[in-house]
Amino acid sequence: MALHIGTSGWSYKEWKGFFYPPVIKTTDWLSYYATVFDCTEINMSFYHLPKQQTVDKWANAVPAGFKFCPKMSRYVTHIKRLKDVEDSLDKFFNVFDPISDLLGPVLIQLPPSLKYDHDIVAAFIQSLLKKYPMHRYALEARHASWIN
């Protein structure tokens, strides 16, 4: 089992001069980041899906073995609350499947208000595993009912 270490993104202007050299262009931040870390979360996919050309540019900026961990769209987790999300999952994975060799786990962060419901969760996981078995997933439950 490989251990990958990274952060929840690489595009932080506060890092310039601290992590990133002062003279480096923002367009080169990911390439520089990938010399120090070997994975990163893609947080923007939670808010809106990146364009395919953007994802391709990211893929070209990192070495083989680097892993991107895209965060599942909030439309799936927070708006639809895991129900009736097949079309939304298709849109999400269509963006990232071209770089599947660079994908780490997909982060599924649930809203703090989403209580555990066995039927909803089972149907969601079943649809993921049936249609997208090649991916790995990390589920972040944030409501106390998930503990039981």
Protein language model features and the residues they cover:
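Residues lining hydrophobic/aromatic ligand-binding pockets adjacent to catalytic sites
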Residues: 1-148
